[in-house]
Amino acid sequence: MSFQPLDPDFENKIKESFSRQGFMDFIGAEITDIRPGYCEIQVPYKKELSQQHGYFHAGIIGTLADNSGGYAAFTLMPADSSILTVEYKLNLMAPGDGELLISRAQVIKPGRTLTICRPEVLLSRTGFRPCVQLH
């Protein structure tokens, strides 16, 4: 699906907003790809982000899905807008066992006040495999 951003400077708007999220900095997350209707965020594994079995904590997985979806939607919004999450449901399909967590989100239905996105969260250890489904 091809989208036209309402803000020609959407990439800088996203990067500036992301830089104000202290938690993203704290966990070591980086935006690695931004396009109209799409955002990818990665975070490398570190012990401080793990749960009791040494896997990525589900809270970190959900955070990346939430942020990538929000920023995918934000790419299509006017310059003077802001964004907040309304709802998501997280189904964990596999443990967060990997060296790198990657969330790729795509807008599936843009709207004036509500935009629906589909994040896909992947883990990398020896290749990429999905670990979560969002609804």
Predicted segments, located by residue:
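Short beta-strand micro-motifs enriched in acidic
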Residues: 32-34, 93, 108
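Short, well-ordered beta-strand segments in beta-rich or mixed alpha/beta enzyme
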Residues: 43-44, 104
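Short connector loops at helix/strand junctions that flank enzyme active sites
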Residues: 26, 36-38, 56, 66-68, ...
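Non-catalytic linker/capping segments at the edges of enzyme domains
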Residues: 1-42
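Active-site helix/loop of acyl-thioester processing domains in fatty-acid/polyketide metabolism
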Residues: 59-79
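A conserved, well-ordered hydrophobic junction motif at loop->secondary-structure transitions
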Residues: 45-46, 50-64
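HotDog/MaoC-like acyl-thioester-processing domains
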Residues: 3-9, 79, 95-104, 108-135
